[in-house]
Every structure is written in structure tokens, then in C-alpha cells.
Amino acid sequence: MVTKVKCPTCQTELEWGPQSPFRPFCSKRCQLIDLGEWADEEKRIPGEIDPELLPYPEEGEQWQ
């Protein structure tokens, strides 16, 4: 049985398998549209930011 999924960008139905090199996207175009949305911060993973993971000190703090 062939698994079919919808492209998260344009909702086109496609088969999930080696014949779909851009999966879960239907094309390179849809893949790049999604990447651009992440780069523009239109998409993000919800949650609090751990201050210990920040590369720079917050304003007013000193480097250790």
C-alpha cells in the first residue's frame, strides 16, 4: 500500500517514498517557501528561551 501525504505548503497530495525527493514537500519550490517562512520567523517552535543557551549576555550583564 502506498502512503499518500499532503504537501504542507500547497496541500498537493503526493506519494511518500524514494520517488518523492522533496518529501514531505511536493517540489523544491514548496520546500524553499517553507524554509523562507522559518527564516522570516513566521514559524517557530513555542516555548520559553533558556537564557543559558543564549550566545550573548542580556543587556546590562557582563561577560564572564
Swiss-Prot record:
Source organism, top-level taxon: Bacteria
Residues given in the record as Zn(2+) binding sites: 7, 10, 26, 30
Cofactor note: Binds 1 zinc ion.
GO MF annotations in UniProt: DNA topoisomerase type II (double strand cut, ATP-hydrolyzing) inhibitor activity; zinc ion binding
Alphabetically ordered keywords of this record: Metal-binding, Zinc
GO BP of this protein: regulation of DNA-templated transcription
UniProt-annotated stretches for the region Disordered: 44-64
One Pfam assignment: YacG
Cofactor section: Zn(2+)
Gene3D superfamilies cross-referenced by the UniProt entry: Erythroid Transcription Factor GATA-1, subunit A
Role description: Inhibits all the catalytic activities of DNA gyrase by preventing its interaction with DNA. Acts by binding directly to the C-terminal domain of GyrB, which probably disrupts DNA binding by the gyrase.
Quaternary assembly: Interacts with GyrB.
Family according to the record: Belongs to the DNA gyrase inhibitor YacG family.
Name used for this protein in its record: DNA gyrase inhibitor YacG
Source organism: Aeromonas hydrophila subsp. hydrophila (strain ATCC 7966 / DSM 30187 / BCRC 13018 / CCUG 14551 / JCM 1027 / KCTC 2358 / NCIMB 9240 / NCTC 8049)
Gene responsible for this protein: yacG
